[in-house]
C-alpha cells in the first residue's frame, strides 16, 4: 500500500464520520454497522495497516470516499457541503488537540475503560455510545473551536443521537490524527488534488 493510499484511507475515515454525523442530524438514523465501524476505530491500538483500523474493508469507508471525491473534484453539483465543513473542522480540532497533552492523557486513560464496556455490552450498546459521547464532551468540547452540527432539532435533541454524533466526531478526529501520522497535510488538499483523486478512484470503485 502506497503512502498516499494510507493517507486517503485515514482521510476517508474523517469524511465517513462527517457523512454519518450529517445523516444523524438530518434523519436521526444510521446503520448499526456504520456506527460500529466508526466507534470500533477508536479502540484499534496496534493495526497492521491503516485499513485495519476500519475493519480491513474499503466498503466500510465508501461513503467517506465519495464525499472526499466530491470535495476534491470541486463540482458544485455533487459537493456535500455539510460533510465537507465537518471534515475540515475535525482536521482543525485535531491540530488543537495535538497541543493538549492533558486532554490526550484523559483520552488515553478512558479508551481502555470503553474497551472493557464493549467486551461486556457490545460496540453499539447505548452505554458504549454514551461513554464515547461523554469522552468527547469532556475533552474536545472544552477547546475553543467547536463543531456546529446543523440538522433537525428533533433529532439533535435526542440524547442517544447527541451521544452518537459526539462519539462519531471523536472517531473522526482520531482518523484526522491517523492521517497526520501517515504523512497527511492540509496543503495536499489544495495542491495535490489531481494526484489524490487518481489514487482515490480505485478505492472508490474497487
UniProtKB/Swiss-Prot annotation:
Its main location: cytoplasm. It comes from the Bacteria. The keyword Protein biosynthesis does not apply. GO terms for cellular component: cytoplasm; plasma membrane. It holds the Pfam family DUF489. Transmembrane segments: none annotated. Keywords: Cell inner membrane, Cell membrane, Cytoplasm, Membrane. It is a peripheral membrane protein. It is found in: Cytoplasm; Cell inner membrane. Belongs to the HflD family. HAMAP family: HflD_protein. This is High frequency lysogenization protein HflD homolog. It comes from Pseudomonas syringae pv. syringae (strain B728a).
